[in-house]
A protein has these predicted regions:
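Bacterial N-terminal signal peptides that target proteins for export
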Residues: 2-12
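Hydrophobic alpha-helical targeting segments used for export or membrane insertion
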Residues: 13-19
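Sec/Tat signal peptide C-region and signal peptidase I cleavage site
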Residues: 21-25
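Periplasmic/extracellular electron-transfer cofactor-ligation site
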Residues: 27-71, 77-82, 90-100, 124-127
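Alpha-helix N-capping/helix-start residues
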Residues: 29, 85, 111-112
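Conserved interaction-surface patches within small, structured recognition/assembly domains
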Residues: 101-106
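Short, exposed beta-strand-loop hairpins at the edges of beta-sheets
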Residues: 107-125
Length: 127
């Protein structure tokens, strides 16, 4: 393979991977709503409606462990992780790895598309 062909092949591969990433970057809110059904076992979207997990109302406007009327693990409080699309994506991929010692009994969402869809739903549903 000549040098020009190698560069062309790299460009095609990179372009394809960027296109796939871009397709999931915004997420599908309707699909995210369906995915949230599993989260709803512990989390509510309404303000002050804490369950086993904290209410997610206003989650994009606060830091981890900051909701006054919920008892967080010391690890979650110490993290003070600012919640945004990027940090939620990382956390939801593997909660125990991202904040070691947190009490959330959930192994994570391995698929990037699923996380993007859930986050897109949460952006609108938690305002």
């Amino acid at each position: 393979m000549n040098v020009m062909s190698k560069h062309a092949l790299r460009f095609i591969v990179l372009s394809g991977s960027l296109a796939v990433t871009g397709a999931h970057a915004d997420g599908d809110s309707a699909r995210g709503k369906k995915l949230f059904e599993e989260c709803a076992a512990c989390h509510a979207l309404e303000r002050g409606a804490n369950g086993v997990g904290p209410s997610l109302n206003g989650v994009f406007e606060r830091k981890a462990g900051e909701l006054a009327d919920f008892r967080y693990s010391p690890a979650m409080k110490r993290s003070a992780l600012p919640w945004n699309a990027r940090t939620l994506d990382i956390f939801l991929a593997d909660p125990q790895q991202e904040i070691k010692g947190n009490r959330m009994p959930f192994s994570g969402i391995p698929e990037a598309r699923d996380r993007a869809d859930l986050i897109e739903y949460l952006k609108a549903a938690t305002k």
